[in-house]
């Protein structure tokens, strides 16, 4: 009996050992066949994109929003869209960023660009990060820019008005130019300046002379912001020319250059490779040639949608930048649509400058803004009166229209009547209360501006032999738009 019990015990032990061996083998096989499960942190953008710049940025929590691929729009300017996001999700995301150690540099306030866009900009380590929410579109734009800096003029500073005389006025000067181009100088109440473009290289010495004529003798003009609408030579040429001459550089102080350098993708999509990127590359680097009042190198700042700049007594809103135009959705492949849209608020009045913007810019603007946004006191006509179209004219209301050239046609192709937009310009002139060009001299508007009170200064003496002098020839051909009122 004892022997039988021993045999049963041995059999039981053997079964236990075999069972254990079986489970050991199965566990080993299972471990070898089952891949290791990677834990994905969906609170970070690393869960949604492989782009290196976004790996350490918290993801935006959204119920219905869709994340786009990351696109490079410029000089380290990496854009991600969140289509279908809400204002509440935007505000929650702003709080999330601050909790994650992102330092808020600025925002555009509860006014939210007149109710169209909330925008806030942050810094962390060497990263600048701007979040803009287009309220009408339920669309959030995220722009991550490693190595970029944010302008101090994105924040209001009351001290900039200290010592300003109570009777000081803000004036806008549309400068007389050699040929084609944009050149606007805004003289602020503190005696400093904001410049838009500046014209071609040949206009550079006249621009410097004019700035010096506007300040007390012996003082250097202080340019708080120099905006370049886009990288075409009739807009950035004067700035580049000045930067190459140390004597000219030393005639002015420049606090910052505001320019959006396009990426190779933008050049390829907008121009099918037909645009020379050299001008854009040079303009993107030019700020370092200048010094501010403290002797530091001026910086380049990239204007982004929804940002608001405070220069002394005026505000400038970035109504549109190239980041709002998806590359695959351009209505036309026209590099002019990289022009930035800037809405100026001066003494309660509205002044729009948008460079050479073309169909894409106009149509996107009409989608993003009600027509009331374009109830304009002063309007700088697009592309020197070439890109004038009835559909946009009828969408807006104008009091004063400034022609940035006295011509109705392109100077380089006067034989193409389609560029003249004769009927379209006539419709624009009939739609405004007054129009004026710089054909007889620089035009000056004093704010608050009343229709009919502009002044035309004495025509320039073209004393510098640095460019083709076409003034008399153009006047003789009758291409001058002139002035008028309705």
Predicted regions and their residues:
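Binuclear metal-dependent phosphoesterase catalytic core
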Residues: 401-404, 409-483
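N-terminal Sec-pathway targeting helices
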Residues: 1-15
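Terminal, regulation- and interaction-focused segments at domain boundaries
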Residues: 22-25, 55-108
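Sec-dependent signal peptide cleavage junction
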Residues: 20-38
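Active-site metal-binding motif and surrounding structural segment of the metallo-beta-lactamase
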Residues: 202-259, 367-386, 397-401
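Compositionally biased P/S/T/G-rich terminal and signal peptide-adjacent segments
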Residues: 32-79, 149-153
């Amino acid at each position: 009996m004892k022997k039988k019990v021993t045999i049963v015990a041995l059999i039981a032990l053997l079964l236990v050992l075999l069972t254990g061996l079986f489970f050991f083998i199965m566990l080993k096989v299972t471990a070898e066949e089952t891949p290791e499960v990677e834990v994905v942190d969906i609170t970070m953008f690393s869960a949604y994109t492989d782009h290196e710049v976004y790996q350490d940025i918290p993801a935006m929590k959204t119920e219905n929003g869709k994340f786009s691929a990351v696109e490079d729009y410029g000089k380290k300017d990496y854009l991600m869209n969140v289509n279908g996001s809400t204002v509440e999700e935007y505000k929650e995301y702003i709080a999330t960023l601050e909790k994650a150690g992102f330092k808020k540099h600025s925002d555009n306030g509860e006014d939210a660009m007149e109710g169209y866009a909330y925008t806030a900009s942050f810094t962390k380590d060497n990263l600048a990060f701007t979040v803009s929410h287009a309220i009408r579109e339920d669309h959030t734009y995220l722009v991550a820019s490693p190595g970029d800096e944010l302008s101090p003029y994105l924040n209001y500073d009351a001290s900039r008005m200290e010592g300003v005389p109570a009777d000081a006025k803000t004036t806008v000067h549309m400068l007389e130019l050699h040929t084609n181009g944009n050149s606007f100088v805004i003289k602020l109440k503190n005696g400093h300046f904001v410049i838009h473009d500046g014209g071609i290289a040949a206009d550079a010495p006249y621009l410097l002379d004019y700035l010096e004529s506007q300040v007390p003798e012996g003082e250097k003009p202080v340019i708080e912001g120099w905006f370049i609408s886009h990288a075409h030579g009739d807009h950035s040429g004067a700035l580049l020319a000045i930067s190459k001459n140390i004597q000219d550089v030393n005639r002015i102080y420049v606090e910052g250059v505001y320019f959006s350098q396009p990426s190779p993708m933008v050049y390829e999509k907008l121009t099918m490779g037909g645009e020379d990127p050299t001008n854009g590359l040079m303009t993107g680097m030019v700020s370092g040639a200048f010094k501010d009042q403290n002797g530091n190198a001026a910086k380049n700042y990239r204007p982004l949608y929804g940002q608001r700049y405070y220069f002394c007594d005026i505000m400038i809103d970035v109504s549109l930048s190239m980041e709002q135009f998806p590359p695959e959705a351009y209505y036309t492949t026209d590099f002019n649509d990289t022009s930035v849209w800037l809405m100026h608020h001066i003494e309660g009045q509205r002044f729009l400058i948008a460079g050479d913007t073309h169909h894409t810019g106009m149509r996107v603007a009409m989608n993003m803004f009600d027509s009331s946004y374009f109830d304009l006191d002063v309007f700088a006509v697009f592309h020197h009166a070439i890109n004038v179209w009835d559909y946009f004219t009828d969408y807006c209301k104008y009091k004063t229209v400034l022609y940035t050239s006295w011509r109705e046609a392109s100077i380089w192709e006067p034989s193409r009547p389609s560029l003249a937009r004769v009927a379209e310009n006539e419709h624009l002139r009939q739609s405004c209360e007054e129009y004026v060009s710089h054909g007889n001299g620089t035009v000056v508007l004093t704010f608050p501006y009343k229709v009919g009170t502009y002044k035309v200064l004495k025509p320039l003496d073209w004393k510098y032999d640095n460019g083709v002098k076409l003034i008399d020839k153009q006047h003789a051909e009758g291409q001058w738009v002139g002035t008028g009122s309705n």
